[in-house]
């Protein structure tokens, strides 16, 4: 009975299909390649040994929907007489569309002057956004919630023209 040694090696052929000509960060490429493992290294023939591949989801978050990464390993079996055989194991990882994130600074509020006829009320803040899919473009838009309330202690409702003017006062840019 021959003892067979199993070894594997990455083929250094990692490719990112992203239509933007970008290359994979070397640290991420190293994490992707390090994800492959085999079980038994030396065994009496005939036998089988399991393999597995595992990579942290965070290492793939940059990969957008429609993009893929391909790479391969060569598995070599060497018997006790020195004869060898090889097999190439190919991997393809397909990306998904990770949702963008958005946040905004809260409005600080302001108080109308007693004589507000010439007063310009203003407030400002920032909208922060990100998308871990590195090739995605993020568009920011806003829509009013139609929840303008008038606290006047008389039960009156706000005039629709005034509500529209309040909504029109918000803009980005």
Predicted features and spans:
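Extracellular ectodomain surface segments
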Residues: 1-32, 101-171
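Residue-level signal for well-ordered, solvent-exposed loop/turn and beta-edge residues enriched
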Residues: 83, 99-101
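Acidic, turn/loop-rich segments in luminal/extracellular domains of secretory-pathway
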Residues: 20-93, 114-117, 151-173
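Extracellular interdomain linker/stem segments of modular secreted and single-pass surface proteins
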Residues: 92-99, 133
């Amino acid at each position: 009975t021959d003892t067979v040694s199993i070894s594997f090696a990455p083929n250094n052929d990692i490719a990112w299909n992203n239509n933007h000509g970008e290359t994979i960060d070397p640290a991420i490429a190293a994490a992707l390649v390090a994800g492959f493992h085999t079980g038994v290294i030396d065994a009496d023939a005939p036998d089988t040994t399991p393999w597995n591949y595992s990579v942290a989801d965070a290492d793939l978050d940059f990969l957008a929907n429609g993009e893929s990464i391909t790479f391969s390993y060569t598995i070599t079996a060497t018997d006790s007489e020195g004869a060898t055989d090889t097999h190439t194991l190919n991997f393809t990882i397909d990306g998904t569309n990770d949702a963008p994130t958005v946040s905004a600074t809260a409005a600080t509020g302001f108080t109308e002057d007693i004589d507000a006829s010439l007063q310009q009320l203003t407030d400002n803040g920032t909208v922060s956004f990100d998308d871990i899919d590195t090739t995605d473009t993020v568009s920011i838009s806003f829509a009013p919630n139609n929840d303008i309330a008038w606290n006047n202690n008389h039960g009156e409702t706000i005039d629709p023209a005034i509500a529209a003017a309040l909504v029109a006062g918000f803009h980005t840019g």
